[in-house]
Amino acid sequence: MKLLVVFAMCVPAASAGVVELSADSMSPSNQDLEDKLYNSILTGDYDSAVRKSLEYESQGQGSIVQNVVNNLIIDKRRNTMEYCYKLWVGNGQDIVKKYFPLSFRLIMAGNYVKLIYRNYNLALKLGSTTNPSNERIAYGDGVDKHTDLVSWKFITLWENNRVYFKAHNTKYNQYLKMSTSTCNCNARDRVVYGGNSADSTREQWFFQPAKYENDVLFFIYNRQFNDALELGTIVNASGDRKAVGHDGEVAGLPDIYSWFITPF
């Protein structure tokens, strides 16, 4: 009888162990949740990504969002910008402020910023002289990093599940655009100007974030030509370098072709 009693007492304990194991196995790990969020962003399902992010944050699991954002930037995913934009306009501004690098918030909020080319440490500006169309050539300034010559802000445009940006220069009230003509220094690279209007895709840009030596950087591409914004190798008497559109692959070289976006 003692054996029977002991056996009867052991059965509930074993059953409880089975139930506990089953519950644990049904609970998704943080890695699973990160993978699902990451994949939602990569496939362009931004509404789902925003819902997941808001849910994780409300449950005290914001580290999931933080890790996904870090991985997106390290992997140089353009979709990072769309995800950030949809959070910004979809009740997720606090998530952007908390888990994205500062530069993302500056871009989305339309704050005044400086665009500094990493390779030469020069800030983007528009020249003082104009052509017959009242356009100004864009340069990297050899000295200035503090006046409104190098002050810009971004205006967002959402189209076909993508976010694009118009870059507005504070000093001259003009928009950064890429010319249809090429630079005389390189027959493949296009000249970059500031112009009064912003009614075509030549005045629209998209960003690809990257990380290099712990710095958050951006490749800046023109929507119409898909050329990356860069500064040329030729230096004028003022120490300025002309801005052009690079006709070629740049994503593998963030140390050369990327930009810092910093507060003005």
Curated annotation (Swiss-Prot):
GO cellular component, as recorded: extracellular region
UniProt xrefs under Pfam families: Lipoprotein_11
Compartmental location: Secreted
This protein's record includes keyword Heme: no
Coiled coil regions in record: none
Family to which this protein belongs: Belongs to the 30 kDa lipoprotein family.
Extra information: This lipoprotein belongs to the group of structurally related '30 kDa proteins' that comprise major protein components of the fifth (and last) instar larvae and of pupae.
Protein name as it appears in the record: Low molecular mass lipoprotein PBMHP-12
